[in-house]
Amino acid sequence: MNFKKKCEELNIDLPGEGEYAVGMMFLPRESDEDLECEGIFETILREEGLKLLGWRDVEVDRNAIGEIAKGSEPLIKQVFIDKESYTTEEFERKLFIVRKKAEIAVRNSTMHNKGYFYIPSLSSRTIIYKGLLLARQIGSFYKDLSDKDFKSALSLIHQR
């Protein structure tokens, strides 16, 4: 995926490959709870000494999914985080800590729709596109996956 190109459109200045992390974030759709979750996440990010680069709405095609999936579909965003001077191992460890702290903070909040908050992936190495989808639906649901600039060393689809 050419995130550099996508992020330039949003005025997000991404560093070189491997120098930033991408987080896939599932957020509540109702009211302003998505912004509340983002705020919690950003606070924890700062507390852990990490730098937020920006947020991106993940483009999806809701016509590619069934009615049950539509009824429980979260708001899906990507967050970009600068690696700065951390080693890859230090960075990945910090990202893991941020993810766990954010999950706990949202779970302990008073938000009504906190169950929608989920972080499928937060890493400088791996991005997980996940959903209540059949294998044949994932490529058409997530527009990133059908983008001509999308490149991956490995793609794996798991279906229950």
Place the predicted regions along the sequence by residue:
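N-terminal segments that mediate ammonia production and transfer
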Residues: 1-160
